[in-house]
């Protein structure tokens, strides 16, 4: 994955004069698929490199992203614990511009688990990552709007393709992201 990212950035630097750097941050709402839990709020922040102009562009990026879930009690009691999983995401998106300001995008995303904080209802915490696979693959889809003065906004959904093997259960991270950014 690291070599692929370096190659994409290198091709972009030397292959086109229509390339732009940018930064992006926003709110994330994450949950596990096929798991009895509630969504957990978090944030994401990172950068991207948009290669291309006009109708189509490739956009590799890198971002810090909070994922995870809130486990609830068996009888509908308040939240039992919050499990926050922190990842470095590396998406490679294909953007298609339908109007000068409106685009849709999709592509693969590799993620590496960098830390975890499991907060139990009794106040104790666990930071061990042994019960979770250290990487995952997802598909990303979304829609973006280019605003005046280089600003942009987007809504995206990360759909986990590969199981996180969470305590030997077949669950995947699913994340809704609302972002604002700036393109230099």
Protein language model regions, located:
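Hydrophobic, lipid-facing positions within transmembrane beta-strands of outer-membrane proteins
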Residues: 41-47, 88-92, 137-143, 174-178
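Sec-dependent N-terminal signal peptides
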Residues: 4-13
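Flexible, solvent-exposed loop segments that connect beta-strands
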Residues: 31-37, 66-86, 114-135, 163-176
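Transmembrane beta-strands of outer-membrane beta-barrel pores
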Residues: 27-31, 51-55, 64-68, 110-114, ...
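Outer-membrane beta-barrel "beta-signal"
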Residues: 144-151, 172-184
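Outer-membrane beta-barrel strand-turn architecture
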Residues: 17, 51-55, 96-100, 147-149, ...
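Cleaved targeting-peptide boundary
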Residues: 20-28
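Repeated loop/turn-to-beta-strand initiation elements of outer-membrane beta-barrel proteins
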Residues: 21, 55-58, 102-104, 149-155
């Amino acid at each position: 994955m690291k070599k692929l990212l370096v190659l994409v950035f290198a091709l972009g630097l030397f292959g086109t004069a229509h390339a732009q750097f940018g930064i992006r941050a926003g709110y994330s709402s994450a949950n596990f698929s096929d798991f009895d839990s509630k969504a957990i709020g978090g944030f994401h922040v990172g950068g991207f490199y948009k290669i291309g102009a006009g109708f189509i562009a490739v956009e590799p990026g890198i971002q810090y992203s909070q994922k995870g879930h809130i486990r609830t009690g068996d009888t509908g009691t308040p939240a039992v614990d919050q499990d926050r999983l922190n990842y470095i995401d590396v998406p490679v998106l294909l953007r298609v511009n339908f109007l000068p300001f409106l685009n849709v995008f999709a592509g693969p995303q590799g993620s590496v688990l960098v830390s975890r904080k499991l907060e139990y209802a009794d106040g104790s915490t666990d930071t061990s990552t042994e019960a979770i696979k250290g990487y995952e693959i997802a598909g990303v889809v979304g829609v973006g709007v280019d605003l005046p003065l280089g600003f942009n906004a987007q809504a995206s959904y990360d759909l986990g393709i590969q199981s996180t093997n969470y305590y030997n259960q077949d669950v995947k991270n699913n994340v809704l992201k609302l972002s604002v950014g700036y393109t230099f």
